[in-house]
Amino acid sequence: NTVSSFQDILMRMSKMQLGSSSEDLNGMITQFESLKLYRDSLGEAVMRMGDLHSLQSRNGKWREQLSQKFEEIRWLIEEMRHRLKITENSFEQITFMQALQLLLEVEQEIRTFSFQLI
């Protein structure tokens, strides 16, 4: 379940002390939360049976927003890969591996939802 996975990853990331990069980590946590909310809102639009008109009226630039979210995901994936390369701490490695896996799942879910809305 990606909801509990999100909570687990966010909790684990918030426990990490990455020294000078804790600001970066907080930024990543914020982006994770933002992506989760975005994924959930797309899912709700799909649940209302392809409620594209509602989505468009609420946010006329939803395609732009979708593109921006994919950019955020790509950036986070690169950031996770970079962190995996530089960390020696196994707790951090496991956390970043799980976060990376979760990002890939969320990217796929957002892609699936957006295809259903087009």
Curated annotation (Swiss-Prot):
Family named by the database record: Belongs to the influenza viruses NEP family.
UniProt entry keywords in alphabetical sequence: Host nucleus, Host-virus interaction, Transport, Virion
Gene: NS
Subcellular location: Virion; Host nucleus
Extra information: Average number present in a viral particle is estimated to be 130-200 molecules.
Organism: Influenza A virus (strain A/Mynah/Haneda-Thai/1976 H3N1)
Any one of the GO BP annotations: exit of virus from host cell nucleus through nuclear pore
Protein function: Mediates the nuclear export of encapsidated genomic RNAs (ribonucleoproteins, RNPs). Acts as an adapter between viral RNPs complexes and the nuclear export machinery of the cell. Possesses no intrinsic RNA-binding activity, but includes a C-terminal M1-binding domain. This domain is believed to allow recognition of RNPs to which the M1 protein is bound.
Subunit and interaction comment: Binds M1 protein. May interact with human nucleoporin RAB/HRB and exportin XPO1/CRM1.
Key word Transport present: yes
InterPro entries (UniProt xref): Flu_NS2
Motif Nuclear export signal in this chain: 9-18, 82-91
Name of the protein in its database record: Nuclear export protein
Superkingdom of origin: Viruses
Keyword Repressor: no
Pfam families tied to this protein: Flu_NS2 (PF00601)
